[in-house]
From Swiss-Prot:
Keywords tagged on the record: Glycosyltransferase, Metal-binding, Queuosine biosynthesis, Transferase, tRNA processing, Zinc
Cellular component aspect of the GO annotation: cytosol
Family the entry assigns: Belongs to the queuine tRNA-ribosyltransferase family.
Complex formation: Homodimer. Within each dimer, one monomer is responsible for RNA recognition and catalysis, while the other monomer binds to the replacement base PreQ1.
Recorded superkingdom: Bacteria
GO molecular function: metal ion binding; tRNA-guanosine(34) queuine transglycosylase activity
Binding residues for Zn(2+): 308, 310, 313, 339
Signal peptide feature range: none
Protein name: Queuine tRNA-ribosyltransferase
Binding-site residues for substrate, renumbered to this chain: 96-100, 150, 193, 220
Higher taxonomy: Bacteria, Bacillati, Bacillota, Bacilli, Bacillales
Catalytic residue list: 96, 270
Protein EC: 2.4.2.29
InterPro entries reported in the protein's UniProt record: ArchSynthase1/Queuine_TRR, TGT, TGT-like_sf, tRNA_ribo_trans-like
């Protein structure tokens, strides 16, 4: 049998927490896990160049099937030689299936066994996305890791609805495997659903593991549920997944959730949070978040975070960044975006080092204390 395009290499387990250190091998290089993946929705991580992403050690980025299908069209990306060539990125790329966007962006949708009828959120045109179509688009994009097309139920959802949804997602996963045309070049991950119901998560994981995907995602979290619910779901879901395959928690990117997810056995994370809040002038620091529009930074000539080694912090002051953000200058957004992405990528580097040293529990305690998560009514990002 030919070697799988995606392979997980286990390195070690943290004796203090059970978190795992590993490495994922792809056709476009390998990366250590736990890892955070910057999101490049439209084949670009907003305001960042590929070289800038490399300078902060991003080993894999995420791109969005739904958005690239609408603009510029997967046929154009294929003609360009695939997503890697199109955007000049020679490291790993993961594409989502488009399912989440269909369920979150379209106000009008009709779910049937065959797929989902919905309206284009840009112009109202009628569209149809099925497991087969999602595979066709992702095969054309040529990402290293593709995602199965799943149903994304709202939170909270009634048990009976969720049960039907999980069963449909399992049937769709099987159809995705059958329709996947480049299984020797692209790895396809299944997505475990089931909301907060343990028996449904168990059923979903069992169904998908029996299909032997090269990796598994945990979907349906970070959709509005409290953080303790997410942690509880992870506690009973990750042990259901194979130890020799990567585990990916979709749509999660706040520092606390990254650390807590790693402690519960997750290997891969993605989220638009660092880039989205950067565009509003909000930045991560080791002492918590700062809003750079705040008047108190008008004459503050220190870097955003004096412990940070990123390009922004080595070269520019809070006062300068505040000025740029308040004047809606693109360069200000570039500086805050670079810093936030670097902050999360560096945080994951610290998490990996703490796993090596069997002290991730201690690291969590120190980080949470400084960041402000232990304060009463602390915000979760």
């Amino acid at each position: 049998m030919a070697e799988q395009p995606i392979r997980y290499e286990f390195i070690k387990e943290c004796k203090q927490t059970g978190a795992r250190l590993g490495r994922v091998h792809t056709p476009h290089g390998s990366f250590e896990t736990p890892v955070f993946m910057p999101v490049g929705t439209l084949a670009t991580v907003k305001t960042m160049s590929p070289d800038e992403l490399k300078s902060m050690d991003a080993g894999i980025i995420l791109s969005n099937t739904y958005h690239l299908w609408l603009r510029p069209g997967h046929d154009i990306v294929k003609e360009a030689g695939g997503l890697h060539k199109f955007m000049n990125w020679d490291r790993a790329i993961l594409t989502d299936s488009g399912g989440f966007q269909v369920f979150s962006l379209s106000k009008f949708r009709n779910i049937e066994e065959e797929g989902v009828h919905f309206r284009n959120h840009l112009n109202g045109d009628k569209l149809f996305l099925s497991p087969e179509k999602a595979m066709e688009i992702q095969n054309a994009l040529g990402s290293d890791i593709m995602m199965a097309f799943d149903e994304c139920p709202p939170y909270p959802a009634e048990y009976d609805y969720m049960k039907r949804s999980v069963e449909r997602t399992s049937r769709w996963a099987e159809r995705c495997l059958e329709a996947h045309g480049r299984s020797d070049e692209q790895g396809l991950f299944g997505i475990v659903q089931g909301g907060e119901y343990e028996d449904l998560r168990t059923q979903s994981a069992k169904d998908l593991v029996s299909l032997d995907f090269p990796g598994y995602a945990i979907g349906g979290l970070s959709v509005g549920e409290p953080k303790h619910v997410m942690n509880r779901v992870l506690e009973f879901t990750t042990p259901l997944l194979p130890k020799d395959k990567p585990r990916y928690l979709m749509g999660v990117g706040s520092p606390d959730a990254l650390i807590d997810g790693a402690i519960r056995g997750v290997d891969m994370f993605d989220c638009v949070l660092p880039t989205r809040i950067a565009r509003n002038g909000t930045v991560f620091t080791n002492e918590g978040r700062l809003n750079m529009k705040n008047a108190k930074y008008e004459r503050d000539f220190r870097p955003i975070d004096e412990e940070c080694s990123c390009h922004t912090c080595k070269n520019y002051s809070r006062a300068y960044i505040r000025h740029l953000i308040r004047c809606n200058e693109t360069f200000g957004i570039r500086l805050t975006t670079y810093h936030n992405l670097h902050f999360l990528l560096h945080l994951m580097e610290q998490v990996r080092q703490a796993i090596r040293e069997d002290r991730l529990g201690d690291f969590r305690e120190e980080f949470f204390e400084r960041y402000g998560y232990n304060k009463p009514n602390a915000k979760s990002f």
